[in-house]
A protein has these predicted regions:
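Short alpha-helical DNA-recognition segment
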Residues: 36-55
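Short C-terminal boundary/hinge segments that cap the last helix of small helical domains
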Residues: 76-92
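DNA major-groove recognition helix of helix-turn-helix/homeodomain DNA-binding modules
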Residues: 64-81
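A short, Lys/Arg-rich alpha-helix, primarily the initiator
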Residues: 2-35
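Extended amphipathic alpha-helical coiled-coil/heptad-repeat regions
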Residues: 116-401
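Alpha-helical residues within helix-turn-helix
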Residues: 31, 41-42, 70
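Alpha-helical segment of the N-proximal tetratricopeptide repeat
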Residues: 89-112, 121-134
Length: 407
């Protein structure tokens, strides 16, 4: 299932009026109407006008008692008001746990209602707990209810979608979705999480203007409000970003001063430095045994192993399929599997079809460099100079586009 960013933007444009009611009657009515396959006209037939039902479903008005009785009869549903405090408490609980990076344990039966708030809670929970396919199905169920969301709920929806897109490897789309919530505000936990994610994505895409304009003031804000754990995460992302621009001496000095970094994080930073500087034999021993620590370690590990030609270790990593939900990691793993093991396709055929034609180029700068080097090496070896030039132009434009992302 593909998540279309344009569809989300169009739904937000249709959101002309903010909901004035917080009851769940409207979204429950909409759920049952769609379950029965009825249009607005068919749902309102014999009860009220189409515009009246539309306003009820979008939480702009509350139906009078005489209409509620008719709706209950037509849709075979109980529309008596139920307290919605539980759903709001669950939202706050999930956000607070996620903000402090604590395990989230919630029984899904508490989020099994037919109203939009329950659907939103399920989307956030499934996304945070890495249930990507179920989260994508929940997204499709929630989309018709965008008009029902208040400002806080819309922020939660956009953040959930950005998380989901990031897990798929669609970093630029995730960044664009976060920027649908303008202007930037960090006046709550959710606002801080959204800004943290923007900067994290910017560091992976080499979006230099956004980093220069926002990083220092965001970290200062987080420290002033004693959100030290978030500030430390951003500092780690920033050091990983800086690795490509500084000397080893300066890097080691920064790591010595960064007492908040975990040992694993320091190892990743050093390994990435050596990899970017072509010292592949020095890079791999640093992260050996940590290849599956997280997706960044995995991405770096398979690229290093590809460079040093360690087929046994590479095959073990590829066969783990730990990050199968990430489109770009899947492509890289499939390519390396074809290159070294299955050999059903030539490397040039794979790059031409899967990278240049069928799939989007990656948004992570390291993965763009990977495809640039692999395509030039293979195309030139086979005399496909036109394809090599075309791929170079595509990647150059992609890198430029990522560094100039609107914000």
């Amino acid at each position: 299932m593909y998540i279309h960013i344009g569809f989300i933007k169009n739904q937000l444009r249709l959101r002309k009026h903010l909901p004035t009611m917080q009851q769940d009657v409207g979204s429950i009515l909409k759920h049952h109407r769609k379950e029965m396959g009825l249009t607005l006209e068919e749902g309102a037939e014999g009860i009220c006008s189409v515009s009246y039902l539309s306003k009820v479903e979008n939480n702009l008005i509350h139906p009078s008692d005489k209409y509620i009785a008719l709706f209950e009869e037509k849709f075979k549903v109980d529309l008596k008001e139920k307290p919605s405090r539980l759903e709001e408490d669950i939202i706050d609980f999930i956000i607070n746990k996620h903000f402090y990076d604590e395990p989230i344990q919630v029984d899904l039966k508490f989020m099994s209602g037919l109203d939009y708030k329950s659907k939103l809670n399920q989307l956030m929970y499934l996304t945070i707990t890495n249930q990507v396919e179920r989260a994508k199905k929940q997204y499709m169920e929630l989309m018709p209810y965008i008009k029902n969301l208040n400002t806080k709920e819309l922020k939660l929806f956009l953040y959930s979608m950005a998380l989901l897109l990031t897990k798929e490897g669609r970093l630029k789309d995730a960044f664009s979705v976060l920027n649908l919530d303008m202007p930037y505000k960090m006046d709550c936990y959710l606002g801080c999480l959204m800004m943290k994610m923007r900067i994290m994505l910017a560091t992976k895409m080499n979006n230099h203007p956004f980093i220069l304009l926002n990083y220092e003031q965001v970290v200062a804000y987080l420290i002033d409000h004693e959100y030290y754990h978030i500030a430390h995460e951003l500092k780690y992302d920033y050091i990983v970003y800086l690795v490509q621009f500084i000397t080893l001496e300066n890097l080691e000095y920064m790591l010595d001063k960064s007492l908040h970094l975990k040992d694993e994080q320091k190892k990743y930073v050093l390994a990435r430095y050596h990899f970017l500087n072509g010292s592949y034999e020095e890079a791999y021993p640093i992260i050996q045994g940590l290849e599956l620590y997280d997706i960044n370690f995995y991405n770096l590990s398979i690229q290093i192993l590809n460079k040093i030609g360690d087929k046994e270790a590479l095959k073990k990593l590829i066969s783990s399929q730990k990050y199968k939900d990430n489109i770009q990691m899947n492509l890289m793993s499939s390519y390396l599997n074809e290159k070294y093991f299955s050999r059903r396709l030539t490397t040039t055929s794979f790059i031409k079809n899967q990278i240049m034609k069928i799939n989007d180029l990656p948004d992570m700068i390291d993965q763009l460099h990977f495809w640039y080097e692999e395509s030039l090496e293979n195309f030139k070896a086979h005399g496909f100079y036109k394809d090599a030039t075309q791929m170079g132009h595509l990647i150059y434009r992609k890198i430029r586009d990522l560094s100039l992302t609107e914000y």
